[in-house]
Amino acid sequence: MDLRDLLSDPRPFALLRRRVPGRAEHPVEVLIGPVGSRDRLAELPDEGLALVPFRQIRERGFDVRDDGTPLLVLTPEESYEIPLDEALRRLPAHEVRVEGGGFDVGDEEYAGIVGRVLKEEIGGGEGANFVIRRTYEGEIPGFGRADALALFRRLLEGERGAYWTFVVHTGDRTLVGASPEVHVRMSGGTVVMNPISGTYRYPAEGPTPEHLLDFLADGKEIEELSMVVDEELKMMCTVGDMGGVVVGPRLKEMAHLAHTEYELRGKSSLDAREVLRETMFAATVTGSPVQNACRVIERHEVGGRGYYAGALALLGRDAGGTQTLDSPILIRTADIGADGRLRVPVGATLVRGSEPAGEVAETHAKAAGVLTALGVRPGRPRAERELPRLADDPRVRAALDGRRSALAPFWLRMQQPAAEVSGHALVVDGEDTFTAMLAHLLRATGLAVTVRRYDEPGLRAAVLAHEGPVVLGPGPGNPSDLADPKMRFLRELARTVLREHRHGVLGVCLGHELLAAELGLEIVRKEVPYQGAQTEIELFGRPETVGFYNSFTARCDEEAARELAAHGIEVSRAANGEVHAVRGPGFAGVQFHPESVLTLDGVAIVGESMGRLRGASAV
């Protein structure tokens, strides 16, 4: 079949150019067939191309504005491949014009939203980072199938480094884009995720290693990427049978910009549809922790997200009959209606160091990048020759290697359980799936682990009956806000386990703050949130490099420290009185996250803590 036949064939179609690992060439794949809707991911067929909207995250019980965007699947009746050069010859090459154009949320309004998120959400302990979207809107007069194919051709010609370049035409809606980022890939039981964060936008005169090195040394960019690696490791530890391994960092070079990225790999025995469900959706397009990020998105964004930050998902089977899944994140994508209305959603990642004006500029640059790549907005003249690969510069390689050395070695290799500690730990999840990573860390010390959410029926009784250590895990929110039912319950639970549980309790981040409050220490809001910060501290007399994700902290002065010491309780604190850790008969608490990739020796810290708790009696 000739690609030009798609102009007259009324059936839905998809054209995909995928970067398939292990293949030297990456042809254009053509899928033609009917499109139908489904309610849940579990209803997807074994083979087909799914369009997964952001609202589908409701399957995980997360808050989301339901805009009615359907979960669709194209079931191929015909499929074939075309070499790239042949596809370029046969696809329409005419110019596509966009009229009007502007953001649905103005610059001043968006800057105000950014400021509120920084102050109220990140400053209020609701999370480490959040992605807030606005949408560039315009109109393509007389839009039709030929225009969709012409836009796809422009992307094939002008973009490089994309993971998927695609056009999907459902009959009444067209998605065309070049996504740089894997949502999740599964083949032969191996699951791969690809957290990307940090963007070096090429200057008008072109990219240089010197400019790139400045970008690679930017602390804000480093923290952004580290935070999303942690967030996606949470997902990998949920779907992976033995956790995950961090590969990288690497540089992803595209036509107009470059990104820093990692790859996460793990083994999974789950069904591909379950893997897809448990990985909805990446922190790079939501925030962290993801569940609370969804609440923040619902509170601050205007309207629903449609397919933005959702995923395409190509399901199939390999020659041996094993399930396969290949899924890019739906970013850098134009969503075009049958009436020619064009929507280009873009988001900025807000972290503690963000400036509202800078994030406004970021969304302008991202929208312009998509429209330029599509050829509907003028860009810089194309270079006469291919740009040199920046990643080949020895200084760039050294800078990337330096970032890797700042990650916990535990997460850089496949892990096997040790036999340092025996028993069964019960982990209480306070709405942050850092507990999945924490459980993996605990298993690595030799413990069996069960994770239960704080709001599960019967949790309090289960905790008191548990004959092993209890871990009060992390979670968003203000630990002093007893008007919050979650905090009221967790505060009471902390009091109960300290008094009545006889097998030891460890508090992590929020759990630590709850224990500290029960010890009589003051809990205060930090002047500057400490979200995604890697710092060297003195931990009970020895130096440790650890990762913090907190907006609140316990404070302890000299007098309070002496009083606690008289009761056998040690306090590890900074010079300003902020408490890093506490430990006493039958309990311990750490403000930092030992399970984070930012804590270099977290497994040893947890192993030592559990060893001290073993057989101890609570106060």
Segment roles from a protein language model:
Residues 27, 43-46, 185-257, 337-381:
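Cytosolic ligand/metal-binding cores
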Residues 18-22, 28-146, 188, 221-223, ...:
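Non-catalytic accessory segments adjacent to catalytic cores
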Residues 263-391:
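Conserved hydrophobic core element of enzyme catalytic domains
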Residues 134-223, 316-344:
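An anion-binding catalytic pocket shared by soluble metabolic enzymes
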Residues 489-499, 504-508, 512-604, 608, ...:
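Pocket-forming structural segment of enzyme catalytic cores
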Residues 78-100, 139, 200, 208-298, ...:
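Contiguous alpha-helical scaffold segments within structured protein domains
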Residues 388-422, 595-619:
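Acyltransferase
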